[in-house]
Amino acid sequence: VDHHVAKESRVTCTLVNPRVNDAEDAPWQTLCTAGLVFKLVHGVLKVLRLAGDERGTSIAVKDYLDLAALGTIADLVPLRTENRILAAHGLKALGEARRQGLRALIAVSGMEPGGVLSSVDVSYRIGPRINASGRLADASLPLRLLLSDDPADCLRDAAQLDAINRERQEIDKKVTEEAMAQAKAMGDLAGYVVHGDWHPGVVGIAAGKICRALDRPVIVLGKEGESA
């Protein structure tokens, strides 16, 4: 299951991807992978129920609306058609914070578990703390947090994610300042390619900020080992 544009349309495995062979105006075209997984599970359960298979009633798919909305909003896909529906219903579930991991994550993000959450809260508070771990450290940490039902473990992991995000913000600020200085030193060009010994996990963020500031195409290259 994936939502990214595929390089090849011919694959030798079962692929659920609306960007392959589907019409561009299909209502599911903008679903992210979290939304696609939610729809896939919903469809499989429906088929099982219609076939009289008791497994079709073994999972309440609505119990996963919070995770579907979290992925949808944090992935910054357009909040229209089915994405909007997932986000609207999922935000209510997110606000209830029935999962211990989400309660801890909401708390370290400076909000009150059980309160009303908006898409902005997910995009600018919760999402960055989840993504920071994948950018700088171990991407399995937020997964462990969301799967855990131990309050103490969740608080510890959420605090670690918060610390990693603060580190990411500091690195991002440094990289953006250095890359911006390089770009400005080049003068008024049609576009910029800047590079340095920068962490590859934040160069995309820096490029976006410089692009908006200079109103020019920008490529920021970092370094990982011996490779740029």
What kind of region is each of these model predictions?
Residues H4, D25-W28, P113-G114, G208-K209:
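A generic local secondary-structure boundary/capping motif
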Residues V1-H3, L15, L214-V218:
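Extended, hydrophobic alpha-helical segments in both membrane/secreted and soluble proteins
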Residues S9-V11, A206-A207:
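Short Gly/Thr/Asp-enriched flexible loops that form oxyanion-binding sites at enzyme active sites
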Residues H3-A6, R19-N21, D197-W198, K223-G225:
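Short, ordered loop/turn segments at secondary-structure junctions
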Residues V1-E8, R98-A104:
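An acidic intrinsically disordered interaction segment
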